[in-house]
């Protein structure tokens, strides 16, 4: 999909750059593959804000996307590509040979009419096909990678993202991720071939604040412009730098502070994403 810019009839139109959706289906999603989605506005069940700067936005219908790809050895045909408001990537509606339908993440270069298949054995290395990592050729570009067999894809699901299979070692696959991290994943975990669709997502320009509001994003207020009652960086006469190392509103270090605490899975990370920055 190409990028689309507009004639500068207003200041926001001048700056607006969006992804063209010319090749996407214009109708409604398949009703049996959707669910209702209520807007939480960043609140929990007590009505308290747990995520700041969220609220409003357009009403959405949730599309049930198949991240597990457990329909083995049944060929499917891509009926159409669709926009999904709940994610940055596009999705594809697949009609399987037995009559079932499912949404999958659409990879790049997947077109209407293409055949896709998921299997526990080796299948063709072409976009949209899914198979265990132990059967995928080394060097392949993959997405929607499982971290535990049968759990469903968790790695490389955003627009334009991918992982690369760089090797194998004692039943484990070695993956290089977009972040630069190299990690081990069990060879029986499924992965889909190709990179995720909509790689131009990173080049869009909203053009105006209202477009963020349509997505349910409210203004993100800095701590240094608040009062002391609201934030540790607040207060002071005139503009200040905060006067201390960056902290959250609750006084915890932030901006570069390491937050990873799951030491039991450290052994699967061969090269940290932070290493290249040293």
From Swiss-Prot:
Q: Does the keyword Ribosomal protein apply?
A: yes
Q: Where is this region: Disordered?
A: 201-278
The residue ranges flagged as biased composition, category Basic residues, are 210-221
Report keywords, A-Z: Ribonucleoprotein, Ribosomal protein, RNA-binding, rRNA-binding
Which Gene Ontology BP terms does the record give?
cytoplasmic translation
Q: Which InterPro entries match?
A: NA-bd_OB-fold, Rib_uL2_dom2, Ribosomal_uL2, Ribosomal_uL2_bac/org-type, Ribosomal_uL2_C, Ribosomal_uL2_CS, Ribosomal_uL2_dom3, Ribosomal_uL2_RNA-bd_dom
**Molecular function in Gene Ontology:** rRNA binding; structural constituent of ribosome; transferase activity
Gene3D superfamilies per the UniProt record, alphabetical: 2.30.30.30, Nucleic acid-binding proteins (2.40.50.140), Ribosomal protein L2, domain 3 (4.10.950.10)
Q: Name one GO cellular component term.
A: large ribosomal subunit
Instruction: Keyword check for rRNA-binding, yes or no.
Output: yes
Q: Which Pfam families match?
A: Ribosomal_L2, Ribosomal_L2_C
State the source organism's domain of life.
Answer: Bacteria
Q: What does this protein do?
A: One of the primary rRNA binding proteins. Required for association of the 30S and 50S subunits to form the 70S ribosome, for tRNA binding and peptide bond formation. It has been suggested to have peptidyltransferase activity; this is somewhat controversial. Makes several contacts with the 16S rRNA in the 70S ribosome.
Family assignment from sequence similarity = Belongs to the universal ribosomal protein uL2 family.
- Its quaternary structure? Part of the 50S ribosomal subunit. Forms a bridge to the 30S subunit in the 70S ribosome.
This one is known as Large ribosomal subunit protein uL2
Which organism's genome codes for this protein? Rhizobium meliloti (strain 1021)
């Amino acid at each position: 999909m190409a990028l689309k810019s507009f004639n500068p009839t207003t200041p926001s139109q001048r700056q607006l750059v969006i992804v063209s959706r010319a090749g996407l289906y214009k109708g409604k999603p398949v009703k049996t593959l959707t669910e209702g989605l209520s807007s939480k506005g960043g609140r929990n069940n007590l009505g308290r804000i747990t995520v700041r700067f969220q609220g409003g936005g357009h009403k959405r219908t949730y599309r049930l996307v198949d991240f597990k790809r457990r329909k083995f050895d049944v060929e499917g045909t891509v009926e159409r590509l669709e926009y999904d408001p709940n994610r940055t990537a596009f999705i594809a509606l697949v009609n399987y040979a037995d009559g079932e339908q499912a949404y999958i993440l659409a990879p790049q270069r997947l077109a209407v009419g293409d055949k896709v298949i998921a299997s526990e054995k080796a299948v063709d290395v072409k976009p949209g096909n899914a198979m265990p990592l132990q059967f995928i050729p080394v060097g392949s570009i993959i997405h929607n990678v499982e971290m535990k067999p049968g759990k469903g894809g968790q790695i490389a699901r955003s627009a334009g993202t991918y992982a690369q299979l760089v090797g194998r070692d004692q039943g484990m696959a070695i993956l290089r991720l977009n972040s630069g991290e190299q990690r081990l994943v069990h060879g029986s975990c499924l992965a889909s071939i190709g990179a995720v669709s909509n790689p131009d997502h990173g080049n869009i320009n909203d053009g105006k604040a209202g477009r963020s509001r349509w997505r349910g994003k409210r203004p993100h207020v800095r701590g240094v412009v608040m009062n002391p009652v609201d934030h540790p960086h607040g207060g002071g006469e005139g503009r200040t730098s905060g006067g201390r190392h960056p902290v959250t509103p609750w006084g915890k270090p932030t901006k570069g502070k390491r937050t990873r605490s799951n030491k039991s899975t450290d052994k699967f990370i061969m090269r940290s994403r932070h290493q290249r920055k040293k």
